[in-house]
């Protein structure tokens, strides 16, 4: 449930007559019931695959059902009825960020979560709830490291669609809006990535391996090279990797970017993929390989299952190598504190600025004249 009636009443009582901001924290969401695979896949095909793959729309429903069979096999049979922890972790992130924000702003700020593909937290459902609670200022905050058409881009697409459906007459209910597209270059996040790597090496690897024998694969979400002119995420992902690498390379020479790609036919993806990156480091003398997710803030089936598959495949050929799989930042208190910190200036702007009234009826079609 997004909010209980008691909480609703309490909020109105305390906040009447003062400015309030709703923070819309957005993530992908993952299925928790295997029955939902086909529906989830069809939405993902429409919103994600359509941005880069030349696939006609009529093929989405049958393709989604076929993909659901593969998903069920992988999650159910290969991984002992795996249930993704993604949604539960995201809720902890939402609660933790809200707690941090409310220490500064009190009940003037509330954090709502929305999932791109999972009811009952679809953007249109959550925005309807935000409107019902009387909020008129909105901070759109996809909790995604890198900005691309596949992350923050679809968040904005869904929010725009939902807001147009929630418009009443001649005055729009949203009076102020801000947006945080990504945090790939935030110093606090970069330093945290470096610290987590160094900490793990010190506790698990430093006693048995020379620094030059420790391979580090810094994992980003794979990106197709062509995305119909949309921002694909490659530039920010590469910049994120470079910033972290620069802080580690003098002590640990064996570092590589590794892209967690989706193997789709006819589509050129970023290279090297994670498995190839690890093989390259092993070839250069790595006796231990660490897999560190940098382009993912919340654990999901890719960071868990895909990396598990990759390690399993590597173990068959290079059984003498020690493999270390690192978690995402998830609900680490330091991450939740910094994520709240990034929102503070935008919340301050929203609370201090004059309300802007938008009349949707003025947006009539203008013909282009030569």
Predicted regions mapped to residue ranges:
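Active-site-proximal alpha-helix that buttresses catalytic centers in soluble enzyme cores
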Residues: 2-370
């Amino acid at each position: 449930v997004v909010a209980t009636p008691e909480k609703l009443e309490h909020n109105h009582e305390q906040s009447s007559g003062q400015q309030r901001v709703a923070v819309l924290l957005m993530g992908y969401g993952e299925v928790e019931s295997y029955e939902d695979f086909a529906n989830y896949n069809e939405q993902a095909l429409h919103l994600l695959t359509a941005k880069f793959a030349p696939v006609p729309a009529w093929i989405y429903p049958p393709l989604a059902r076929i993909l659901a069979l593969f998903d069920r096999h992988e999650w159910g049979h290969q991984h002992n009825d795996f249930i993704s922890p993604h949604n539960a972790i995201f809720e902890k992130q939402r609660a933790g960020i809200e707690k941090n924000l409310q220490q500064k702003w009190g009940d003037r700020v509330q954090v709502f979560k929305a999932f791109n593909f999972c009811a009952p937290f679809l953007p249109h459902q959550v925005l309807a709830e935000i409107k019902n609670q009387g909020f008129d200022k909105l901070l759109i905050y996809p909790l995604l490291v890198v900005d691309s058409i596949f992350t923050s881009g679809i968040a904005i697409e869904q929010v725009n669609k939902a807001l147009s459906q929630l418009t009443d007459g001649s005055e729009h209910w949203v009076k102020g809006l801000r947006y945080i597209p990504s945090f790939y270059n935030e110093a606090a996040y970069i330093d945290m990535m470096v610290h987590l790597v160094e900490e793990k090496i010190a506790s698990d690897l430093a006693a048995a391996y020379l620094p030059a024998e420790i391979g580090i694969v810094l994992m980003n979400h794979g990106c197709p090279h062509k995305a119909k002119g949309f921002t694909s995420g490659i530039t920010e992902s590469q910049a994120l990797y470079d910033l972290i690498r620069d802080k580690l390379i003098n002590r640990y020479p064996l570092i590589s970017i590794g892209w967690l790609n989706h193997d789709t036919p006819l589509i050129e993806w970023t290279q090297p993929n994670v498995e190839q990156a690890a093989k390259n480091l092993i070839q250069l003398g790595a006796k231990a390989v660490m897999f560190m997710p940098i382009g993912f803030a919340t654990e999901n089936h890719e960071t868990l299952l895909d990396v598990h598959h990759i390690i399993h495949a590597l173990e068959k050929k290079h059984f003498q190598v020690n493999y270390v799989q690192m978690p995402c930042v998830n609900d680490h208190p330091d991450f939740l504190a910094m994520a709240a910190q990034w929102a503070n200036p935008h919340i301050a702007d929203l609370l201090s600025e004059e309300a802007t009234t938008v009349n949707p009826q003025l947006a009539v079609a203008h013909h282009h004249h030569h």
